[in-house]
Swiss-Prot record:
It comes from the Eukaryota. It comes from Chlamydomonas reinhardtii. InterPro entries: MORN. One of its GO terms (cellular component) is cytoplasm. Flagellar radial spokes contribute to the regulation of dynein arm activity and thus the pattern of flagellar bending. They consist of a thin stalk, which is attached to the a subfiber of the outer doublet microtubule, and a bulbous head, which is attached to the stalk and appears to interact with the projections from the central pair of microtubules. It is found in: Cytoplasm, Cytoskeleton, Flagellum axoneme. This is Flagellar radial spoke protein 1. The modification Asymmetric dimethylarginine is found at residues 243, 428. Its main location: cytoplasm. MORN repeats lie at residues 577-597, 600-622, 623-645, 646-662, 671-685, 691-707. Asymmetrically dimethylated at Arg-243 and Arg-428 during flagellum resorption. Probably methylated by PRMT1.
């Protein structure tokens, strides 16, 4: 990448910057271009990003924020565009840095190399009609791998000349411009130290704090609280106490239609943090009217009362002989002009209330919680609401005193004594997310779901996926079947151990008479930014959407069907799912973890297992093959817990069609199955034995032949077996017949639902272990027969171990 340096026209009306990353409209990529502004003091002055589409009082505007663009804006093409209007700039802003970033998506590789195309485009024009329009290829930078942010370019303003644009091209693994503030400052220093650019901002930066960051939270951002608190640190920092700050602001009231008309009152917004259990039932809540619950409370602690010195109000008395404005001979004074209207910050955080969560003290049954801000005035809704916003703040190590409070003054004084510019701040902002409302656009909105907090259990399907270290769920199910089986069996064993540990803890608690108050299952708390608008006059009116919110993590739209390729679902019985949803059901590649320890990885269609898949059962049995409507159907292989294996055709979950079954005695049974039972001609073989005969519902019935190869001695060395083997024999064949009670093998009649009707007059079919009613008849004496080959070609590949191989020419060969 080679960009500049070159000076942009000083009197230009508009500069445009954009990134292009979509090769086709179908590509589901979520890259964005941000701009970070630094002032002459080297301080971060303002930011522009997807959730803050205007900055510097409209001098920077995101392309999608159409109503904030001046009428004369010349629109440019681009997947994400920033418009800059230099004539609106404040003089204190000296440096702008442009950052391309790809937000991380849990369960999906999503970095700047995920697209086959990545370009940075610049265009401008001046009053003389001079124009510039050029794009620069960023793809070689992203191809390094693991690149989630690129500091693309820097612009700086010098005393002589206009804005100068220069390429940077620094790549970073962090997915947000807010996490690379130290690198942004270093870029400013590099302008001075490496390129000789004289900037006040560079001279003002005395030291760079490697932990400095600003929260840039995107919609549907999903992250564990511990990871968010750690930021760039390698080890997560446990969050034990969380503060949720709430803010909302309003549009100015419309002008009165009649003289003397009182302006309307501000809407009375309320909030509700509803906590749910795994069944979707409300456990408790914190709201405007309900200020306290287990492990949670609303409102800041009462501040200490300041001891104020009593001061007498001094009134100025006019001196003798001085005339007041109404005094005799005095000239009437003009009233002073009204002060200018204060500048309105559209992104002001106006704290309305706070919620404290003592995370370890929350009720164990709480699985998730949803934060909503409501105004159930269905006539006006959110018409007057400008912003609704919340901040998640880690206060595990304490809180910063409120500005202007006695504690803040004392902290500042203590910091000054230590030579610090400001007192240390023990708080960490984990997320700052809000919804911007356009005036009168949201009349139908009466409630906004801002944020979700939820437990992610260690044994979830998502964590099984993460343990594989693959890019996405399609890559997970595309692994070798044996690899998937090992991963699912590891989940099964972990589930068994966890259940045993829970049972032991419950027994110990019962014996000691203590109550288990903590959640016994290992988990982490995560947050997910929502920003979803709903109507209705109560929470009950959006019950369906709320169920989706607390049990589903993926892209959501109010009232719409679930549709996401990286969704996570939890179910009341403890099952979890990670994979694709379409039209509100599981569809596409997915991974399902049963609470029993069973697991499935494969394709779904219409909400059911359908297509190729791998499944591990609670007893350790495994299936690899085809599914239809949640059942085995097509070709597949089932390994039973005892080690035996069936490979062949299935229908409706049963063996049906041609197949091969290897048992634990290293024998091979071949034939045709119907509804799980062997029927018609079948062959069973061992190294020294072959049985060929007719079967009825799994029982031998009809003519048969036993073939015995007496000289195959498995416990003798290979050379000995080869030495004693003759060209043929002694191998004998015995024609015979088996019989079963008449009528016992008839197919049962079925009822309307397809279930067999019990027939008390029908004789029972012989069955294991006694096989009562089964008869055997030798048809004639044994006769010599050719040697047999084992294992049979039709039984290969052999799916079990330690099976010897015999051939006619060489004897025991393995």
């Amino acid at each position: 990448m080679a960009l500049g340096p070159f000076v942009l026209p000083f009197r230009g009306d508009q500069y445009s910057f954009g990134i292009n990353f979509k090769s086709s409209p179908e590509e589901k990529l979520n890259f964005d271009l941000s701009c970070v502004a630094f002032d002459v003091k080297g301080q971060l002055h303002d930011t522009l990003h997807a959730r803050k589409p205007t900055a510097l009082d409209g001098a920077l505007v995101k392309g999608f924020e159409k109503q904030a663009l001046p009428e004369e804006t010349v629109q440019v093409e681009g997947d994400d565009v920033i418009y800059m209007f230099p004539k609106k700039f404040e003089r204190q802003v000296e440096v702008l840095l442009f950052v391309a970033s790809a937000p991380s998506i849990p369960g999906k590789k999503h970095d700047l190399d995920s697209s086959s195309k990545l370009e940075f485009a610049v265009s401008y024009s001046d009053v003389g009609g001079q124009a510039f329009n050029q794009s620069f290829d960023l793809k070689p930078l992203a191809a390094q791998g693991g690149v989630s942010s690129i500091i693309v370019a820097v612009m700086y303003l010098q005393a002589e000349g206009g804005w100068t644009l220069r390429s940077v091209g620094d790549c970073h693994p962090f997915d947000s411009p807010g996490l690379i503030v130290p690198e942004l400052k270093q870029t400013i220093l590099n302008l001075r130290d490496h390129h000789g650019v004289q900037l006040d901002a560079a001279d003002a930066i005395q030291a760079i704090d490697p932990a400095e960051r600003v929260p840039v939270t995107r919609q549907f951002q999903d992250q564990s609280l511990d990871e968010a608190s750690a930021g760039r640190a390698a080890e997560p920092a446990p969050v034990k106490k969380l503060r949720i700050d709430l803010s909302w602001t309003f549009w100015p009231p419309p002008p009165p239609t009649e003289e003397g008309e009182e302006p309307p009152e501000e809407p009375a917004l309320e909030y509700n943090l509803v906590m749910y259990n795994k069944d979707g039932e409300e456990v408790q809540s914190i709201s405007t009217g309900n200020r306290e619950a287990t492990g949670a409370r609303a409102g800041r602690p009462e501040p200490e009362e300041d001891e104020e010195e009593e001061k007498e109000e001094e009134k100025e008395e006019p001196e003798e002989g001085e005339e007041g404005e109404e005094g005799e001979g005095g000239e009437p004074k003009e009233p002073p002009p009204p002060p200018p209207a204060p500048k309105v910050d559209p992104y002001e955080f106006k704290e309305r209330d706070v919620i404290y969560l003592d995370v370890p003290d929350l009720p164990a049954e709480v699985r998730s919680m949803v934060l909503l801000v409501t105004n159930y005035d269905e006539e006006n809704g959110f018409t007057r609401v400008r912003t609704v916003r919340c901040r998640l703040v880690d206060v595990s190590n304490g809180e910063a005193p409120l500005p202007g409070s006695k504690a803040a003054v004392a902290a500042a004084a203590a910091a000054a004594e230590q030579g610090l510019a400001a007192p240390p701040n023990p708080e960490r902002v984990l997320a700052d997310y809000g919804v911007l409302s356009k005036y009168e656009d949201d009349k139908a909105t009466t409630q906004v779901a801002l944020m979700k907090l939820y437990k992610e259990y260690a044994d979830s399907a998502f964590n099984v996926f993460r343990g594989a270290g693959v890019d996405n769920v399609a890559a997970f199910i595309g692994q070798e079947p044996d690899t998937i089986i090992n991963q699912l069996k590891a989940y099964l064993e972990a589930t068994k151990k966890q259940k045993a540990a829970e049972a032991a803890a419950a027994a110990a608690a019962e014996e000691s008479g203590e109550e288990i108050t903590a959640d016994p299952k290992p988990h982490v708390w995560r947050f997910r930014a929502l920003g979803l608008n709903f109507g209705g006059d109560s929470l009950e009116a959006i019950e369906h959407d709320l169920k989706n919110l607390f049990a589903f993590d993926g892209d959501l739209a109010p009232g719409a069907a679930r549709d996401s390729d990286t969704s996570r679902s939890s179910f009341p019985n403890g099952d979890t799912y990670f994979g694709s949803y379409a039209d509100d059901v599981k569809h596409g590649p997915g991974l399902y973890a049963f609470a029993t320890g069973a697991g499935y990885a494969g394709e779904y269609a219409g909400g059911k297992r359908h297509g190729r898949g791998v499944m591990v059962f609670p007893d350790g049995g495994t299936y690899v093959g085809e599914f239809v409507a949640d059942k085995f159907e097509g070709q597949g292989q089932y390994r039973y817990p005892d080690g035996s294996v069936y490979t062949g055709s299935w229908a409706a979950g049963q063996k049906h069609g041609p197949g091969v079954y290897w048992d634990t005695a290293r024998g091979c049974l071949r034939g045709e199955w119907k509804k799980g039972l062997l029927v018609g001609k079948g062959t069973y073989e061992q190294p020294a034995l072959r049985f060929e005969g007719e079967f009825v519902r799994g029982m031998p019935a009809g003519t048969a032949t036993y073939t015995l190869t007496g000289h195959r001695t498995l416990d003798m060395p290979c050379f000995a077996a080869q030495h004693i083997q003759a060209e043929e024999g002694p191998t004998l064949a015995l024609p015979c017949a088996y019989g079963i009670p008449p009528g016992s093998g008839d197919e049962p009649q079925l009822d309307e639902e397809g279930q067999p009707i019990e027939d008390t007059d029908k004789p029972p079919l012989p069955a294991h272990p006694k096989y009562e009613g089964l008869t055997f008849t030798a048809e004639q004496l044994p006769g010599a027969a050719p040697d047999t080959v084992f294992p049979p070609e039709e039984g290969k590949p052999v799916p079990i171990t330690a099976v010897p191989a015999f051939s006619v020419s060489t004897g025991l060969v393995a």
